[in-house]
């Protein structure tokens, strides 16, 4: 069984390996002027940065890391999120699995791997390298479980998030400017804008739900302006009797149904994949799209379109 650590604990692993693998040298006439060379270390790293821009960033970071740590070679394996979820747990149970990998947060992935004793706790490294000064408690909690994997949000630290991301609304600046539209200040203004965009014969929200996972972003963007942060945390961690069956969640679902009925999403969106819908948006098909800040790199290159970003606004009374 092979335990592994998350993406941003690479430095710690390599520090230990380099010190362990450097042979002792007894000075002699021949060796006093020679620098001992550590045995080459291969570090197998799995990540899900498969899109062009972010993949290029990872390649650059890996190259810089290797240059800073002579004798260390990173064998990078790139997978989609779906592939990673399907293959990672089995791979970690074998000696040939990755040394470092990204793990989807939450009970079904990280929690299950903690229960299976596949992940290495990082508490000591967090203390030694003062990660608490760099990462907020809320970010650390999302990567923490009790050793039995049953309690989410407390206990041992099992990973460090490579990014802190938000879900919001990207908009096509050219389309907005050509029609005199501005960023809405309230949710009512946002829905008025959707109607105006539709009336112009433009798809208001570029969206494809074929992959399944990304549909929660459309819902949660609305949900988050209706509920409190305490509710979100209680629900995520499964504490204080938090339930999904609330008036606010029902209201958010009703908004989704209303947008579908009014054709505010891309035509036949249930048959369009996430990446394909983003490509359409990038080429000017659709005035807006609701997704995460991770897409920014893909939108700023290889296109003549200009894009902006804003968080979905709430009404003053959060209704």
Where are these regions (language model features)?
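Short helix-initiation/N-cap motifs at beta->coil->alpha
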Residues: 78-87, 187-192, 268-282
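Short helices/loops that flank or line small-molecule/ion binding pockets
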Residues: 85-96, 116, 175-176, 195-199, ...
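Short, solvent-exposed loop/beta-turn-alpha elements that line the ligand-binding surface or hinge
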Residues: 123-138, 226-251, 301-302, 314-319
């Amino acid at each position: 069984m092979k335990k592994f650590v998350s993406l941003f604990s690479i430095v710690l692993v390599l520090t230990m390996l380099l010190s362990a693998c450097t042979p002792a040298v007894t000075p002699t006439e021949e060796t006093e002027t020679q620098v001992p060379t550590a045995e080459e270390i291969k570090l197998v790293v799995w990540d899900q940065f498969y899109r062009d821009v972010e993949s290029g960033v990872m390649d650059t970071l890996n190259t810089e890391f290797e240059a800073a740590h002579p004798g260390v070679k990173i064998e990078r394996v790139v997978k989609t999120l779906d592939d990673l979820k399907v293959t990672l747990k089995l791979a970690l149970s074998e000696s040939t699995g990755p040394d470092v990998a990204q793990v989807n947060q939450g009970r079904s992935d990280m929690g299950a791997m903690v229960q299976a004793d596949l992940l290495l706790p990082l508490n000591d490294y967090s203390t030694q390298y003062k990660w608490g000064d760099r990462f907020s408690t809320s970010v650390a909690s999302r990567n923490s479980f009790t050793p039995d994997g049953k309690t989410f949000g407390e206990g041992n630290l099992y990973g460090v998030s490579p990014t802190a991301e938000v879900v919001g609304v990207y908009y096509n600046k050219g389309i907005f400017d050509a029609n005199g539209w501005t960023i809405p200040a309230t949710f009512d203004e946002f829905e008025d804008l959707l109607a105006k965009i539709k009336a112009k014969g433009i798809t208001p929200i570029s969206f494809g739900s074929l992959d399944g996972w990304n549909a929660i972003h459309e819902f949660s963007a609305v949900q988050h302006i209706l509920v409190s942060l305490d509710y979100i945390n209680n629900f995520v961690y499964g504490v204080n009797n938090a339930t999904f069956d609330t008036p606010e969640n029902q209201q958010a679902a009703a908004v989704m149904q209303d947008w579908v009925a009014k054709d505010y999403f891309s035509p036949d969106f249930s048959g369009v994949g996430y990446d394909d819908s983003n490509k359409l948006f990038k080429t000017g098909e659709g005035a807006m799209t609701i997704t995460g800040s991770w897409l920014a790199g893909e939108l700023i290159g290889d296109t003549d379109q200009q894009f902006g970003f804003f968080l979905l606004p709430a009404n003053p009374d959060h209704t």
